[in-house]
Structure formats: structure tokens, C-alpha cells
């Protein structure tokens, strides 16, 4: 049996879609959602049994009223390189295959390592050459890993989870009329993420979309 992939509850639909795109079987289990830190950095690695390692760039994660906004970080390059070296050494010294999610404070302190696909991996579905979800599947099936590098350096993505009583059709029409560049992708009827790239005021625009989808604002 292929290796089992662990991921946060609510992300399984994205893993299933990636498996369908690859035309391969899937074996996974979910774990509960954890409380997020205020603002922090995330670096993800995917290791396969055939000694391949894909290390994704550091991204910055911002907490917005319980939702996570993820974007490329503009912190000092030497500082970020030192974190990547630390993660690379840790991954190579580990005998574990699969996904590892490293959480760092903005000052570089290692907070925790999760051996699973977490919500911090959402960004890769839109802005990595090969998503973390796809590479996790490739590693589980001992297939060659894809490229983890960024496709763009100007983007932001945020998750949403709207009350089930809300109608979701009208908000979509309203948002796309005001910003055709939105990517609104659902994991279920009332949850998913909003992504936007190559635009000014990315945080403001994406936060507005999430607020509107969740009924926090009406215009």
C-alpha cells in the first residue's frame, strides 16, 4: 500500500482533486485544525523514499480575524536563506518521508514542525510550479517530485468559511464584477480560498472579498 498522507480537516477535497488530475489512488487521513499564531513564517518540504527533496520558499502568514492570509515574504534575503539552510539540514537528517511544515516566528525562532499538509500549503495550489498537494501524492507513490518554486512574486491568498445560511451565488457575481482577477475556489459549498495576484492593495482587496463572502460586510 502507498504511504498515507496526513492533512488538516477541510483540505482533503484539494488533495482528492490533485489525485484525480494525476490519475492515481489516494490514501489519507485528516487531523483537527489547530489554533494559528498571530503572524509567522512557513516553510514546507516534501521528501520521497527515493531520496528526492522538494523545499518550498518561505511564505509569510498573517492572521485576519481567524482567517489566514498567505503571501511571499519580503524579509531580508540572508535571514531567509539561513532558515532554508536550517530546514534543509533538518529534512536531510530525518528518515521520514512525506510532508513537513516548519513554522517560524518572524524573528526566526522555530515554533513547531507538523508532519502533515496544513492550511499554510493552500498558496501552492495557485502560485507554485507544483503544488504541495501534488508533490505529497508523488512522494507517496514514489514518483519524481515536481518543481517547488514560485510562479509569481506578487500575490496573496486567504481562506474563507461562510455561515451555511448564506447564499453564495450573489457574492460571487458582485466580487467578480468589481475585481475580475479574483480566484475564488471552493473546498465545499461555503468554504475555500480567495487568491489574487499582480494587483495593488492585495491584502485589502482579498480581505474585502473574504468579508463579503462571509457576510461580515454587505458592500
Residue positions per predicted region:
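N-terminal glycine-rich anion-binding loops that anchor highly charged ligand groups
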Residues: 1
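Structural motif
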Residues: 4, 26-28, 53-56, 111, ...
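Internal nucleotide-binding/catalytic subdomain
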Residues: 5-6, 10-98, 104-108
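Electropositive phosphate-/nucleotide-binding environments in soluble metabolic enzymes
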Residues: 9, 77, 81, 97, ...
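Peripheral (often C-terminal) accessory segments that flank ATP-dependent C-N-forming ligase machineries
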Residues: 11-14, 18-19, 31-33, 138-219
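A short, polar/proline- and glycine-enriched secondary-structure boundary/capping micro-motif
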Residues: 65-70, 121-125, 205
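Active-site "cap" helix and flanking loop/linker of ATP-utilizing ligase/carboxylase catalytic domains
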Residues: 86-101, 116-162
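A short beta-strand motif that forms the metal-chelation/ATP-contact edge
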Residues: 108-117
